[in-house]
Amino acid sequence: MKVWKSTICALLLVILLTPCAMAAAAPAPGLTCAPDNRGNLISLQEVGGEYLLFLPSTADLTALTLNFEGEPAALTAGGREIAVTSGQPFDLTALYPGGPDDGVYAFTFRAGSGQTPVKLMVSENIGSMFITSADPVNKGRSYVEQVKGNKASGRMTLIGADGGLIYSGELSQIKGRGNSTWTAYPKKPYQIKLGKKTDLLQTGDPGEAAKTWVLLANYYDKSFILNTLTFDLADALGLPYSPNSRPIDLYYDGEYRGTYLLCEKTEINGGRVDIHDLEGDFEDANPEVEDFDDLPTARGTNAWGNEYQYVTGLSDPDDISGGYLLEIDYSGRAAAEKSWFTTSRGYSLVSKSPEYLSENAMEYISGLYQEFEDAVWNGGVNPTTGKSYTDYMDLESLARCYLILELSQDGDAFFSSTFFYKPQGEDKLYAGPVWDFDSAYGGNYLHFNDTAIVAGATYIGRKLLAIPSFGEAVEQIYENELNRLVTDIVLNADPEAQSGRLRSVAGYIAEVSASQRMNNVLWSVGGPGVLTDASESLRNFISRRNEYLCELDFSQLPDDVFWYLDVPQNIWYYSAVRYVTEKGLFSGITDNIFMPDEVMTRAMVATVLYRQAGSPKVEGPSPFSDVPENQWYSDAVAWAADIGVADGYSDGRFDPGREITRQELVTMLYRYAAYTGADMTAQEIPEKYLDRDSVSDWAVDAFAWAVDRGIIDGTSPSELSPRGNALRYMAAAIFQRYDETLG
């Protein structure tokens, strides 16, 4: 994908959206406006070998302007032709008396003896944002996207879906944002800072005006509505400060960049998390500090012996009781922040605001959260203070936040992007705002079972559900509020169904469908039906999920609901995974994640066999240079090498992390069976397996034995796939059969 800069016919083709066409009032018939400092240029872009123009919903196709070098040109389509002159408006619709073909205006631009096929697409229903870099050559989009910390400035214009001007002025900063969305995907999310506070979402509330906003790429979300839907559902459920958002078409230095979600940033500020700004108090208490980023950090431990990091050299304001905004995050990410602390259960929380905490403030907030965690782990009562967990955390917000995380099946629940805030002068924390749902609702890469408890099976969730008062609160809110919102609004087939901010899935999809179609062409996301499929899949998921949760008694959940989230009970290998787990042969990647599709490694297989043998005592250090002591696999690898189940390499390595094939797994199991004295005679591999000759010579006996004993079967009725990866679910089935047959 690149901006087209061909010199064919000396063409420089751009669509000029004239300022009059974008004014709040519709232009008078026949009126055109000369470009001025509100004109926005959109470049022709090459995508997949085709040239495309992506226009915003406010584009007037009866008064488009092409700018190009050279003599007047012509546009042709369907045997029709219209003349165009650079800088002069023309009526594109004259080429299409019957309308465009499937929403795409395909024409040929002819100039002199050259011609260029062009496809033009137009958005609908949503606004558009135009970002123009102050220095596009040195600090344009490519510079901003090189490193997340790179910052640039420029101007920004935001046009509403109705053509009204919402903002046109200074963009004091644009930079990258996000974690996996920044590193893993080509479509980058941004944070922008305006020159003045503005209510970009036009809520009508002056308190919603702000300088800082985020642009979420939602690259992983095929429907593009998951974040908006969830934010609005949380708002309807009564969670304060749930982010407001709106989809827009983004143009950056003349290039269309796709559908983005213009969203409020999760921060302490008016119109956001509207509590006292303790960060401002720290700034007032330290007037000599010019740049807080320059202050050094130090680490310490609180009264519970848990590590934290704080900023040194800060004077405390008079009151450090709030407000705080905390986020549970992965330890690796937390360590990159200025102020964070760990809990007694090994989890990390970052102070998002204040970003720079003194040691006293860190002691205070980390201690408050730790007392809450201790209370939850002790059945709801802190064993030292005697206080209830609800003395430390607001029950209503915690129960409502939990339900949003659970209904959406958010894989980050209580691991990352889970926020708490604490107002000044209050004794307790509050849960929220909710955040980051672009891979929720069945879209998580772990492929959770639809009927699995997710938020309630992670970190603090499971302990909370063991407390009767929490389960009862969740049950009441679901039965009396959330179920009604889901049934009456979210799943309503009417696109007009709405309650406050919350709309139906059909309504959200209708709003964004034309823009998302352009986005999918730009980013090569699926085919023409991808949005329809995503919409139907989402509705079906929410319907199934709601039905399942409605049947649960949250105050008395059975143990089965806490099974591996990614191993559905209706899948064929469920019984095998359950068998090897209960036998102690396998364990999950985490307490509730099995990752059945992950490939087994040499260390994993050695460990399973070691457990099969009863985990015998191992004397002496590992014989391999790459197997240090005190690793989870150290004893298993040393044992496996000692009895001849697994060999090392000539250079002294074992390579514990190397992924193995099906024939390698079977060979290790075959050697173990021989070690135990089992009968190793076997028939040849049956001829029905057409790929039996692809079994390596060194693995033929092992495969023949495993097939003969019924320990392994084919990946299809006619294929053994000996050189295919040995996945965890396959290995679970193999070891179950072995244990039942020979164990």
Tell what function each PLM region has.
Residues 9-19:
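Bacterial N-terminal signal peptides
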Residues 181, 334-338, 344-415, 421-562:
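Middle-to-C-terminal accessory/interaction subdomains
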Residues 169-175, 555-574, 582-583, 587-636, ...:
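Feature responds to low-complexity, polar/acidic, surface-exposed segments characteristic
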Residues 196-199, 210, 217, 238-243, ...:
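Internal "kinase-insert"/substrate-recognition segments embedded within catalytic cores
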Residues 24-105, 113-118:
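Predominantly extracytoplasmic/ectodomain segments of secreted and cell-surface proteins
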Residues 98-104, 115-167:
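N-terminal module-boundary/linker segments of secreted carbohydrate-active enzymes
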Residues 73-75, 237-249, 410, 588, ...:
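Short, well-structured beta-strand/strand-turn elements
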Residues 157-217, 358:
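Conserved oxyanion/phosphate-binding beta-strand-loop segments in alpha/beta enzyme cores
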